[in-house]
A protein has these predicted regions:
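Residue-level recognition of tetratricopeptide repeat
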Residues: 11-13, 122, 170, 204, ...
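TPR alpha-solenoid repeat register
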Residues: 16, 124-125, 139, 173, ...
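Short coil/turn linking the two alpha-helices of tandem helical-hairpin repeats
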Residues: 26-35, 123, 185, 251-253, ...
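Conserved structural position within tetratricopeptide repeats
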Residues: 3-6, 62, 117, 162-165, ...
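Post-signal peptide N-terminal segment of secreted/secretory-pathway proteins
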Residues: 2-107
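Conserved small/polar residues in nucleotide/adenosyl-binding loops
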Residues: 293-295
């Protein structure tokens, strides 16, 4: 069958890919039969046959959707093949997890990515998996993690948005996506993802700290201050936001304002070591400036 994939007479024929998918389906069924009978079976063969079957049946469906010479679409494959893919999808998760745990992240990514992408296969459109599959955000997060392990920034950017609603991994997926944009040199997308991260995950300091640091280091202190004020309006006792506002005043040499906000940060967290250290530094700098005035 492999030769038929490249043969000019057969490679664009839906039957070719249907047969290829059926072969993988039979491999899968044979291994699962052994498992049911408590005989030795190859778990990776089960998982890889599920992956290949999905790939081949999707290609079959794509070709079968092309109109014939009369302009009509007669896709006899869709119903049975979509049912087979739906039944196989859980093994895409299992295969991805097994390869991920073996630190074979390139292979893991293929499984997780296929699971996520299958939710938008036209042949499964009636199932509305993007809305109904409650595991989708979690598996998109796994795909993002595997992509990060292999350094595939484009894959991170592709799968992370679907992971943002995952309860446990959403904020980290957002962080990886921001890092990926930064690594690719797309500053506009990086800044946008940091801003989105602040709004989606206000309890995560990463996004706010990186955004303020960017504004501050690029001589946009007023933008940083504006953002700090906006965040404090929503959470006036947040120690990080108070500290950042103090730090901005500190850099602007507005020492009295800096002292005020460092003290507010300390009031919010009496063990905030950085705030104690910096308020002491500001007092010292203020004293030095005053001594220079009197010389």
């Amino acid at each position: 069958i492999n030769g038929a994939f490249t043969n000019s007479e057969t490679k664009d024929n839906a039957d070719t890919w249907d047969v290829a998918g059926f072969i993988q389906k039979r491999i899968n069924e044979k291994e699962m039969e052994s498992a049911y009978l408590r005989k030795p079976y190859d778990t990776l063969k089960v998982y890889n046959s599920a992956l290949n079957m999905c790939k081949y049946y999707f290609k079959c469906d794509e070709l079968a959707q092309k109109p014939n010479e009369k302009g009509k679409i007669k896709n006899k494959y869709r119903k049975p093949n979509s049912a087979a893919i739906l039944a196989a999808r859980p093994n895409l998760i299992n295969g991805g997890i097994q390869y991920f745990n073996l630190d074979k992240n390139k292979e893991a990514l293929k499984f997780f990515a296929t699971y996520v992408e299958s939710a938008s296969y036209p042949m499964l459109a009636d199932k509305e998996l993007a809305k109904n599959d409650t595991l989708l955000p979690q598996i998109a997060y796994y795909a993002t993690l595997a992509a990060d392990r292999v350094g595939d920034k484009d894959a991170i950017i592709k799968y992370a948005p679907m992971a943002l609603s995952d309860k446990d991994g959403g904020k980290f997926a957002m962080q990886l996506m921001a890092d990926a944009y930064k690594a690719k040199g797309d500053t506009a997308a990086w800044i946008k993802s940091l801003e989105e991260g602040i709004l989606k995950f206000p309890g995560n300091d990463y996004f706010f700290a990186n955004l303020v640091d960017y504004y501050n280091s690029s001589n946009q202190a007023s933008k940083a201050m504006e953002f700090a004020d906006r965040m404090l309006a929503n959470d006036p006792n947040n120690k990080l936001y108070l500290y950042v506002k103090a730090y901005l005043y500190h850099n602007m040499k507005e020492y009295d304002n800096a002292i005020e906000y460092y003290k507010k940060a300390i009031a919010a967290d009496p063990e905030y070591a950085e705030a104690y250290s910096n308020v002491g530094l500001v007092y010292l700098m203020k004293a030095q400036d005053l001594s220079l005035i009197h010389i």
